[in-house]
Swiss-Prot record:
This is Myosin-7. The modification Phosphoserine is found at S1137, S1269, S1510. Limited proteolysis of myosin heavy chain produces 1 light meromyosin (LMM) and 1 heavy meromyosin (HMM). HMM can be further cleaved into 2 globular subfragments (S1) and 1 rod-shaped subfragment (S2). Keywords: Actin-binding, ATP-binding, Calmodulin-binding, Coiled coil, Cytoplasm, Methylation, Motor protein, Muscle protein, Myosin, Nucleotide-binding, Phosphoprotein, Thick filament. The modification N6,N6,N6-trimethyllysine is found at K129. ATP binds at G178, E179, S180, G181, A182, G183, K184, T185. The keyword Coiled coil applies.
Length: 1935
């Protein structure tokens, strides 16, 4: 196109195409095809360069900025010649590669040519400034132009789509895609502008404009400002970003006339309404309103012009430099006017917008001592409610106390502040979203015209791909949409294109461009994909975001390549998973996704919206159906289940519809590119642009355009259109197949035959060939038209010449005749001829003229008649045509309706079949449930009988228990006396022990003589012990190996996961390595220096490897030493356990000699067994730790080896080696410095572990013991309280009824309605509680199952423990004779035994005290229950009396009351069960959670200990201690051991002293507690007396009320007289009432049971006040009130006195209890501290012994020569002989002591021993019987409760099923009626259609006849006209 042709574009020409001069200058620049290349660059992707040299596959080049680089030869890419600079279609480039495309776009962008063709689609780059390329002049210039005839432009794409629509008769679509901020919205507006302008140009003559509205073209254009105001906002990338997607369809008629338009929107980002990031802002409309351009808006909306006054819209920026909000407001308002919005509609939209701003300012606070929220001021709520047409109080109530549907009923729910804030935001978002959707619907209604439409062009503008720092659910939906659109583009461009080639039989090799995105799409939308899992989680009530994350990981992590675990970086938002999209990897945060997907609303407020006086708001929510709303009837299929549709499901549905629309059209793609992130005009960020080009498939699209055949035409169309190029190839009149004709035609043309291919139905052309054929056709047509024009001009010239010749001949003849006439005109005979000739013909002429006149008149009349007839027929024909069209439309509509009715009928029939199947199934289930219900009813009756029997047994047992308690107290006193005697015997034993020591020293010399003889025996014994120990070790190691194997398997699975992560990291490192290799090759001149450094690092690496190997060898040596130490430790521990067992036997004998009771012996055994169990647990834990340490050492060795391999692999990288080296050094220093801290932490953790285990066992046992009794008592007390409250409420209601019955029938009716409403509410509450009970039972069953599993595991452990105990006993008996005991250990064991005996005695006393206190508590509670039952009976009697009075007034009211009481009793029973179950469930949950927490804590501590052990092992290996140092440590430890033993003895002595103090304090505490309980019982009696007094006061008040009612008439007469007296009395009475109320509140604080009575009294006083205000003042009433006042004063004084006494006693008692409690607490803390110190000392002693033994074993291993072994063996033999002699002496001593003890026992217990034994046996028998009976009773009660719960559940389920069955039956009946109605409608429609069809045929027949008659008449008229013209011509000729 030359410059003259470009002049048509006006000022836009320089921005579309450069001038010829500039193009010539660019083409003549210097260029060397061999040297000018592109080379890769780190920053700029590619740079231009010139080749300097080529050597060995490498190229050295100099870049434009003078930098010299060396790259591989395959990385060099050639530049295109200068004639291709700034080429308009990049598919025409000679060298097509990434840098060529990049630089072409960059150079065109630098010249502000932002549009460029890229094969079949267009690429546009955002200029970030205004360019004059969109005015009307440019639109006109592009109209009707082919793509090749004009520069690239969005108008060209639009015009081509328009022309394709007209020529191909196919719908078109223009897909404008790109990232956010790339310019999609602007290009969409230009496309719409183009279509509106060309339609206006083509139809300017037929414009009709509705008054008050614009034309259709103006309306289409003005829809954009309205949509942008409410749907666009500022984001980080874009100042005017569309936060919704839209698909605009512009409909055209068959001739291309603009017919109508409609808009579909997708996924409005409604979260922006209430939240924005710092660099962003809310939607434009908020700031437009606040711009103060229209002040009346601010007044109407009650707002200011400061955005920071409103929280919702001021979280980010409030102004945008590139947007003038005031001007935009006027544009928006004007757009509403053009679109035909009424002023009411506009104001309603503004009001809702203002209300949303006020919504954000509403504040709420938490009520004191409650979790519920309440309004913190109502000003903003008042404004919002006013603007929305609501009641402010109702709005606040709905927000703070919404009504929630539970089952079939509604209950009021309290909300906390956070919940109210969330609900407020959700409502604001919902209002805005629905208002936006309404606006779009309203615009569509305006754009909808009645004009016929044939085709449409759709323009898609949807949110671009988004990658933010914080990506949430909205970003996933947007990115998923872009993924689908990109897949559509790829499928259309690459897959469908190549499939078309194969389908048409063209030789083609399928090219895989690697652009398939289906994997990512399937990951999101397929079943078990992200969307599916999200919707599934939304259906579960207890699902959270974390469960959603866990499911995602379980289903996709490691299974899908597109799903990854994100790498969280400090300072950035947390991410939970990553998806690999086509545009990059996006990290998503899933917090709040479930709420966003469910999108719940406060249905109470929504109900207010539906009743709003603001018409728009009520319309927005008119069709809203909540999650629990029933399906509306008669709405058809579309409405069913719509209320349960999630946001993701709705988005997928809309997206699928969009994709279906796009697939049905011919798409045109426009790719928008964002040039930089800073919005700078003219700046290209090369890496950013290249990333977009690669992702968008631009290069691949160009390649397939060049390689493939983008243009194709059907053979018939091609033959018809291009036959003109060579007509001889296809002879006229001869039949030739279209394909053969096309082949002949193309073969005859002078074109490249490789540029086209023949398919089965089409001929395919390479890019550009079809344009060439079009040019040839245009040239051919030009030549043909030129020839036709020449021939036509020749014919016309010849015709003109012939006319000239004829005119000349005529003139000659006329001249000759005139000359002849002039010669004879004066001749006389000629004159005579002239006179006679006319006379001869005049008569004949006159006759002919008369005849002609008559004929003319007749023909004229006939003509007029025919003309009139013709007009009539034409009018009739027009009307008939109109009727015909109307009938056709009616027939079409009827056919559509009939088809819809048939579809609905089919669907209803299917639904009916399904419902019938469901009904049948439900009927069967109902029958089964009824059978089960009958069985359960029978079981229930049986259980009730058993329950009554058990209750009687319980009563008997309680009596027996009371007797046993008395005997138990007597026995306890005897036990105390025996304990004192035991203390005296202990002193005697101590003296005997000292004597024993003296004897041992005397026999020491004799024992030395026997040493030689026992050497052999000791040697054999050691060998035997060693072998047996090996057997034990092997068995233990076998079990340990099993455990280790399980641990290793778990570790293996964990390591496999770590291995995957490590492999990924290795891949990343390999990628980094490749990049580093490339950089090394580029930087060749640095290679020598790096090689030298690398060699140094390799040497360092080899040194490190050597060190690692040495450390590993040292670790192996230490492991061997550790193993030897373990065996030695096991031997010593075995010997120690044997000695302990021997000590236990001796202590048992001593205890029996001392006269200990059997109960004490059992307790001692139990304590000893627990001690042994704890010791074994400790040993097992130690072994496990050691095994874990070995596994960790192995793992550490493997990790060290892996690190060595990594060092070998990565030793070429200097920086990483130095970093790792420094890290290793730091870790080594940290381990060295923290070793002592780790050892201390290990000891503390072990101590904490044991303490926590003890506490857990104690808490669990206490919880199990007290749970049953506490639950029963609590439930009984709650039941009595609720019954008392119910009776009080009934009393109040009946008093109110008595006072209201005198007011008449209307008041009574109102009361009846109130009772009905209350009954309904109670039924609703009952149903709600039933649902809650059912869910609680389910949770309880789950927890019970878990508890049973824990119990089974505990039982299994106990069985293992018993088995181990039996084995221990066997070993003990086996080695009893060989055991050698040391004197010092016997002394220590004796002390410990005495200590344990004392502990056991104290524990027995504590347990007995606890039992006595519990019994007292039980008796006290039973007394309270009996008193309460008495009160209940009295209340019931009073209620019965009032009921009798009530029945006298009305029988109907009594019936309603009875029903209400029945429902109330059921409610109370269900509430009781719910409370008991909830408390049980809560305790079980707490216990289970605590056990889980302890377990997790132990696991973590175990893991930490394992890591510490591995670190210590490494430290031991690295430290390399020598044997000499270990020997020193052993000696030091032995010294420390002696010190610790002495300290331990002192601690034990102090502990005994402190425990004695604790025992005495506990006894004092029990006495004080008993005294307090006695005083509390006395206070309870006083409270009961006060309660009875108040009841009497209430009765007297009731009588006075009756008297006042009777005296009402008398009071009216003396009203004026007593007015003054009344005022005085009212003041006194109010003062007395206040005093009474204060006294009652104080009494209420002391006793909760008095609360109900005080409430009754307050109610009575208030009722009295109300009667005084309403009833006239009378003298008699004054007297009555005075009497009441005196009574009230007496009551107040009495209550005040009782209150003061109770308060004084309570204060004294509280002080004593607090003092004792503080003392007890301090003693308990001291005891705990002593226990902790003792356990710490024990652990330290054990650790010291263990370390000592380890050191000894290592020393033995280090000194392995035979001489030392012999010496050691001899010493051991000597020691063994010595100990054997000591054993014999000790046995003799023990016998003597036994004899003495027997004598002492006979002396001390001769008198009362037998009686004591009998009593103790009797006590044990009674206790066993009591325990058995209690267990049986508990089991039976538990079974009975379980059965009752099951019966109630089944009953409730049966009722629910019956209700559901009835509902389903009703639904089936209604559906059947609907089906019948639809059938009738279908039949009627069919009959009507047949009738209309017959009418249509009849009218068609008449129309045809009329047309025939009109044709006949017209032919006659034509004949008459012709005849008349002939007659007229003849007449003229004759004249």
């Amino acid at each position: 196109m030359v410059d003259a042709e470009m002049a048509a574009f006006g000022a836009a020409a320089p921005f579309l195409r450069k001038s010829e001069k500039e193009r010539l200058e660019a083409q003549t620049r210097p260029f060397d095809l061999k040297k000018d290349v592109f080379v890769p660059d780190d920053k700029e992707e590619f740079v231009k360069a010139k080749i300097v040299s080529r050597e060995g596959g490498k190229v050295t080049a100099e870049t434009e900025n003078g930098k010299t680089v060396t790259v591989k030869e395959d990385q060099v890419m050639q530049q295109n010649p200068p004639k291709f600079d700034k080429i308009e279609d990049m598919a025409m480039l000679t060298f097509l590669h990434e840098p060529a495309v990049l630089y072409n776009l960059k150079e065109r962008y630098a010249s502000w040519m932002i549009y460029t063709y890229s094969g079949l689609f267009c690429v546009t780059v955002n200029p970030y400034k205004w360019l004059p390329v969109y005015n009307a002049e440019v639109v006109a210039a592009y109209r009707g132009k082919k793509r090749s005839e004009a520069p690239p432009h969005i108008f060209s794409i639009s015009d081509n789509a328009y022309q394709y629509m007209l020529t191909d008769r196919e719908n078109q679509s223009i897909l404008i895609t790109g990232e956010s901020g790339a310019g999609k919205t602007v290009n969409t507006k230009r496309v719409i502008q183009y279509f509106a302008v060309i339609a206006a140009i083509g139809d300017r003559s037929k414009k009709d404009q509705t008054p008050g509205k614009g034309t259709l073209e103006d309306q289409i254009i003005q829809a954009n400002p309205a949509l942008e105001a409410f749907g666009n906002a500022k984001t980080v990338r874009n100042d005017n970003s569309s936060r919704f997607g839209k698909f605009i369809r512009i409909h055209f008629g068959a001739t291309g006339k603009l017919a109508s338009a409609d808009i579909e929107t997708y996924l409005l980002e409604k979260s922006r309404v209430i939240f924005q990031l710092k660099a962003e802002r809310d939607y434009h409309i908020f700031y437009q309103i606040l711009s103060n351009k229209k002040p009346e808006l601010l007044d109407m909306l009650l707002i200011t012009n400061n955005p920071y006054d409103y929280a919702f819209i001021s979280q980010g920026e409030t102004t945008v430099a590139s947007i003038d909000d005031s001007e935009e407001l006027m544009a928006t308002d004007n757009a509403f006017d053009v679109l035909g919005f009424t002023s009411e509609e506009k104001n309603s939209m503004y009001k809702l917008t203002g209300a949303i701003m006020h919504f954000g300012n509403m504040k709420f606070k938490q009520k004191q001592r409650e979790e519920q929220a309440e309004p913190d001021g109502t000003e903003e709520a008042d404004k919002s409610a006013y603007l929305m047409g609501l009641n402010s109080a109702d709005l606040l109530k709905g927000l703070c106390h919404p009504r929630v549907k539970v089952g079939n009923e509604y209950v009021t729910k309290g909300q906390n502040v956070q919940q109210v804030a969330y609900a407020t935001g959700a409502l604001a978002k919902a209002v805005y979203e629905k208002m936006f959707n309404w606006m779009v619907t309203r615009i569509n209604a305006t754009l909808e015209t009645k004009q016929p439409r044939q085709y449409f062009i759709g323009v898609l503008d949807i949110a671009g791909f988004e990658i933010f720092d914080f990506n949430s659910f909205e970003q996933l939906c947007i990115n998923f949409t872009n993924e689908k659109l990109q897949q559509f583009f790829n499928h259309h461009m690459f897959v469908l294109e190549q499939e078309e080639y194969k389908k048409e039989g063209i030789e083609w090799e399928f090219i895989d461009f690697g652009m398939d995105l289906q994997a990512c799409i399937d990951l999101i939308e397929k079943p078990m994909g992200i969307m599916s899992i999200l919707e599934e989680e939304c259906m579960f009530p207890k699902a959270t975001d974390m469960t959603f994350k866990a499911k995602l990981y379980d289903n996709h992590l490691g299974k899908s390549n597109n799903f990854q675990k994100p790498r969280n970086i400090k300072g950035k938002q947390e991410a939970h998973f990553s998806l690999i999209h086509y545009a990059g990897t996006v990290d998503y945060n899933i917090l709040g996704w479930l709420q966003k997907n469910k999108d719940p609303l406060n249905e109470t407020v929504v109900a207010l919206y539906q009743k709003s006086s603001l018409k728009l708001l009520s319309n927005l929510f008119a069709n809203y159906a909540g999650a629990d709303a029933p399906v509306e009837k008669g709405k058809g299929k579309a409405k069913k289940g719509s209320s349960f549709q999630t946001v993701s499901a709705l988005h997928r549905e809309n997206l699928n519809k969009l994709m279906t629309n796009l697939r049905s059209t011919h798409p045109h793609f426009v790719r928008c590119i964002i040039p930089n992130e800073t919005k700078s005009p003219g700046v290209i960020d090369n890496p950013l642009v290249m990333h977009q080009l690669r992702c968008n498939g631009v290069l691949e699209g160009i390649r397939i355009c060049r390689k493939g055949f983008p243009n194709r035409i059907l053979y018939g169309d091609f033959r018809q259109r291009y036959r003109i190029l060579n007509p001889a190839a296809i002879p006229e009149g001869q039949f030739i197949d279209s394909r053969k004709g096309a082949e002949k035609l193309l073969s005859s043309l002078d074109i490249d035959h490789n540029q086209y291919k023949f398919g089965h139905t089409k001929v395919f052309f390479k890019a550009g060939l079809l344009g060439l054929l079009e040019e040839m056709r245009d040239e051919r047509l030009s030549r043909i038209i030129t020839r036709i024009q020449a021939q036509s001009r020749g014919v016309l010239s010849r015709m003109e010449y012939k006319k000239l010749l004829e005119r000349r001949d005529s003139l000659l003849i006329i001249q000759w005749n005139i000359r002849a006439f002039m010669g004879v005109k004066n001749w006389p005979w000629m004159k005579l001829y002239f006179k006679i000739k006319p006379l001869l013909k005049s008569a004949e002429t006159e006759k002919e003229m008369a005849t002609m006149k008559e004929e003319f008149a007749r023909i004229k009349e006939a003509l007029e008649k025919s003309e009139a007839r013709r007009k009539e027929l034409e009018e009739k024909m027009v009307s008939l045509l109109q009727e015909k069209n109307d009938l056709q439309l009616q027939v079409q509509a009827e056919q559509d309706n009939l088809a819809d009715a048939e579809e609905r009928c089919d669907q209803l029939i299917k639904n009916k079949i399904q419902l019938e199947a469901k009904v049948k199934e439900m009927t069967e289930r109902l029958e089964d449930e009824e059978e089960m219900n009958a069985e359960l009813t029978a079981k229930k009756r049986k259980l009730e009988d058993e329950c009554s029997e058990l209750k009687r047994d319980i009563d008997d047992l309680e009596l027996t228990l009371a007797k046993v308690e008395k005997e138990k107290h007597a026995t306890e006193n005897k036990v105390k006396n025996l304990t004192e005697e035991m203390a005296g015997l202990d002193e005697i034993i101590a003296k005997l022990t000292k004597e024993k020591k003296a004897l041992q020293e005397a026999h020491q010399q004799a024992l030395d003589d026997l040493q030689a003889e026992e050497d052999k025996v000791n040697t054999l014994t050691k060998a035997k012990v060693k072998l047996e120990q090996q057997v034990d070790d092997l068995e233990g190691s076998l079990e340990q190996e099993k455990k280790v194997r399980m641990d290793l398997e778990r570790a293996k699975r964990k390591l496999e996961g770590d291995l995957k992560l490590t492999q990924e990291s290795i891949m990343d490192l390999e990628n980094d390595k490749q990049q580093l290799d490339e950089r090394l090759k580029k930087k060749d001149f640095e290679l020598n220096a790096l090689n030298a450094r690398i060699e140094d690092e390799q040497a360092l690496g080899s040194q490190l490897q050597k060190k690692l190997k040495e450390l590993q060898a040292r670790i192996e040596e230490l492991e061997e030493e550790l193993e030897a130490e373990r065996t030695a430790r096991a031997k010593v521990e075995k010997l120690r356990s044997d000695l302990s067992r021997e000590l236990e036997e001796i202590s048992e004998r001593l205890e029996e000699a001392g006269g200990a009771t059997s109960v004490q012996i059992e307790m001692n055994k139990k304590r000893e067994a627990e001690f042994q169990k704890m010791r074994r647990d400790l040993e097992e834990a130690t072994l496990q730790h050691e095994a874990t340490a070995a596994a960790l050492r192995k793992k550490h060795a493997d990790s060290v080896a892996e690190l060595g391999e990594q060092i070998d692999n990565l030793q070429r990288v200097k920086q990483k080696l130095e970093k790792e080296k420094s890290e290793f050094k730091l870790e080594l220093d940290d381990v060295t410095s923290n070793m002592e801290q780790i050892i201390k932490a290990k000891a503390n953790l072990e101590k904490m572990c044991r303490t926590l285990e003890d506490q857990m066992n104690e808490h669990r046992s206490k919880a199990e013991e007290t749970q049953r009794s506490v639950n029963d008592l609590t439930s009984q007390r709650a039941k009595l309280q609720t019954e008392n409250g119910e009776l009080s409420r009934q009393l109040d209601e009946k008093e109110a009824l008595i006072s209201q019955l005198t007011r008449g029938k209307l008041t009574y009716t109102q009361q009846l309605e109130d009772l009905k409403r209350q009954l309904e509410e109670e039924v609703k509450a009952k149903n709600a509680l039933a649902h809650a009970l059912q869910s609680a039972r389910h949770d309880c069953d789950l927890l019970r199952e878990q508890y049973e599993e824990e119990t089974e595991a505990k039982a299994e452990l106990q069985r293992v423990l018993s088995k181990a105990n039996s084995e221990v006993a066997q070993w003990r008996t086996k080695y009893e004779t060989d055991a050698i005991q040391r004197t010092e250990e016997l002394e220590e064991a004796k002390k410990k035994l005495a200590q344990r005996l004392q502990d056991a005695e104290e524990a027995v006393e504590a347990v007995n005290a606890k039992c006595s206190s519990l019994e007292k508590t039980k008796h006290r509670l039973q007394n309270e229950i009996e008193d309460l039952m008495v009160d209940v009976e009295r209340s019931n009697a009073a209620a019965a009396a009032l009921d009798k009075k009530q029945r006298n007034f009305d029988k109907i009211l009594a019936e309603w009351k009875q029903k209400y009481e029945e429902s109330q009793s059921e409610l109370e029973s269900s509430q009781k069960e719910a409370r008991s179950l909830s408390t049980e469930l809560f305790k079980l949950k707490n216990a289970y959670e605590e056990s889980l927490e302890h377990l997790e804590t132990f696991k973590r501590e175990n893991k930490n200990l394992q890591e510490e052990i591995s670190d210590l092992t490494e430290q031991l290996g690295s430290s390399g201690k020598t044997i000499h140092e270990l020997e020193k440590v052993r000696k030091q430890l032995e010294a420390e051991k002696l010190e610790l033993q002495s300290a331990l003895e002192e601690a034990e002595a102090s502990l005994e002293h402190e425990e004695g103090k604790i025992l005495r304090a506990q006894l004092e505490f029990n006495q004080i507690k008993a005294e307090i309980e006695r005083k509390l019982a006395e206070k309870d009696e006083e409270m009961e007396q006060a309660k009875r007094n108040h009841l009497r006061v209430v009765d007297s008040l009731q009588t006075s009320l009756d008297a006042e009612t009777r005296s009402r008439n008398e009071a009216l007469r003396v009203k004026k007289k007593m007015e003054g007296d009344l005022n005085e009395m009212e003041i006194q009475l109010s003062h007395a009432n206040r005093m009474a109320a204060e006294a009652q509140k104080q009494v209420k604080g002391l006793q909760s049971l008095l609360k109900d009575t005080q409430i009754q009294l307050d109610d009575a006083v208030r009722a009295n006040d109300d009667l005084k205000e309403n009833i006239a003042i009378v003298e008699r009433r004054n007297n009555l009130l005075q009497a009441e006042l005196e009574e009230l004063r007496a009551v107040v004084e009495q209550t005040e006195r009782s209150r003061k006494l109770a308060e004084q006693e309570l204060i004294e008692t509280s002080e004593r209890v607090q003092l004792l409690h503080s003392q007890n607490t301090s003693l308990i803390n001291q005891k705990k501290k002593m226990d902790a110190d003792l356990s710490q000392l024990q652990t330290e002693v054990e650790e010291a012994v263990q370390e000592c033994r380890n050191a000894e074993e290592k020393a033995k291993k280090a000194i392995t020569d035979a001489a030392m072994m012999a010496e050691e063996l001899k010493k051991e033999q000597d020691t063994s002989a010595h100990l054997e002699r000591m054993k014999k002496n000790m046995e003799q001593t023990i016998k003597d002591l036994q004899h003495r003890l027997d004598e002492a026992e006979q002396i001390a217990l001769k008198g009362g021993k037998k009686q004591l034994q009998k009593l103790e046996a009797r006590v044990r028998e009674l206790e066993n019987e009591l325990e058995a009976e209690q267990k049986r009773n508990a089991e039976s009660v538990k079974g009975m409760r379980k059965s009752e719960r099951r019966i109630k559940e089944l009953t409730y389920q049966t009722e629910e099923d019956r209700k559901n069955l009835l509902r389903l039956q009703d639904l089936v009946d209604k559906l059947q009626l609907k089906v019948k109605a639809y059938k009738r409608q279908a039949e009627e429609a069919e009959e009507q259609a047949n009738t209309n069809l017959s009418k249509f045929r009849k009218v068609q027949h008449e129309l045809d006849e009329a047309e025939e008659r009109a044709d006949i008449a017209e032919s006659q008229v034509n004949k008459l006209r012709a005849k008349s013209r002939d007659i007229g011509a003849k007449g003229l000729n004759e004249e």
